[in-house]
């Protein structure tokens, strides 16, 4: 079961190695950052979740932060470029090919927060390192974090036990078995679940075409320039972590 899920995630992520652990995407992102990221770092800012990556980095990184719209103006070399593929706090998707091209131009590796994009968006293979969780676009139970990376990279051997990628890679502690089991049940149905998200997304874009962003639309969620109010007590609205004049809706459970 675990091998089947791991191989499936390798295919979705376009990565050679996938390490699972109990915990959230936040844990996976911080562990990935401490296992691989060092030196000069360029952080591409798009909202709350991209900006939060600064707090997850090793303290000795030399950090430069740029707005996504200013990416073309960045010059010089870096060791790493960091971004959130789908910034759920504002329902914005970066053009990952453009970010990868800038990373190549800067002679840098690419680190991607794929929490809101894995299982839904394409081109994850462009990342050198990425991290995400078992829910959202993988449609599994919450509770598993994943770090995925290319085989030509070697994680640092940190002087900690639990907070150490090699500990989880070598299965030296209890794994996220419940979440892995849920993902095993998703594999054959993932395309069905994804299509429901696509259908919901297209419906919203068509219905509210005058108040949605023209580009950079993620499948996971949509920003509407207006206030959304529930018409049923059973509806749970998404509360974004960014201060917005409009509303963000997510396309699950349709």
Model regions: which residues?
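Short, conserved charged micro-motifs
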Residues: 71-75, 194, 226-231
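PLP-dependent aminotransferase-like
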Residues: 27, 34-79
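Active-site C-terminal subdomain of aminotransferase-like
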Residues: 135-206
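Active-site phosphate-binding strand-loop segment of PLP-dependent enzymes
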Residues: 69-119
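Conserved N-terminal alpha-helix of the aminotransferase class I/II PLP-enzyme fold
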Residues: 1-31, 35, 56, 197-208
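Conserved C-terminal alpha-helix-loop-beta "cap" of PLP-dependent enzymes
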Residues: 213-254
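Conserved active-site segment immediately N-terminal to the catalytic lysine
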Residues: 124-135
């Amino acid at each position: 079961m675990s091998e089947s899920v791991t191989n499936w995630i390798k295919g979705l992520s376009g990565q050679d190695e996938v390490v699972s652990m109990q915990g959230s995407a936040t844990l996976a992102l911080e562990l990935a950052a401490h296992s691989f990221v060092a030196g000069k770092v360029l952080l591409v800012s798009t909202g709350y979740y991209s900006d939060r990556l600064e707090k997850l980095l090793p303290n000795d990184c030399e950090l430069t932060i740029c707005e996504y719209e200013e990416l073309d103006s960045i010059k010089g070399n870096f060791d790493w470029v960091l971004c959130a593929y789908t910034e759920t706090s504002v329902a914005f998707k970066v053009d990952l090919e453009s970010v990868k091209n800038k990373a190549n131009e800067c002679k840098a590796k690419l680190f991607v927060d794929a929490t809101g994009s894995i299982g839904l968006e394409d081109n994850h293979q462009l990342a050198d390192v990425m991290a995400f969780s078992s829910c959202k676009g993988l449609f599994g139970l919450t509770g598993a974090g994943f770090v995925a990376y290319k085989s030509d990279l070697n994680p640092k051997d940190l002087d900690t036990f639990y907070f150490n990628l090699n500990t989880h890679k070598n299965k030296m502690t209890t794994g996220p078995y419940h979440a892995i089991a849920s993902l095993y049940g998703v594999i054959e149905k993932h395309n069905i679940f994804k299509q429901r998200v696509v259908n919901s997304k297209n419906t919203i874009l068509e219905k509210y075409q005058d108040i949605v962003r023209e580009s950079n639309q993620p499948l996971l969620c949509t920003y509407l320039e207006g206030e959304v109010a529930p018409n049923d007590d059973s509806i749970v609205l998404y509360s974004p972590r960014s201060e917005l004049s409009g509303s963000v809706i997510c396309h699950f459970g349709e």
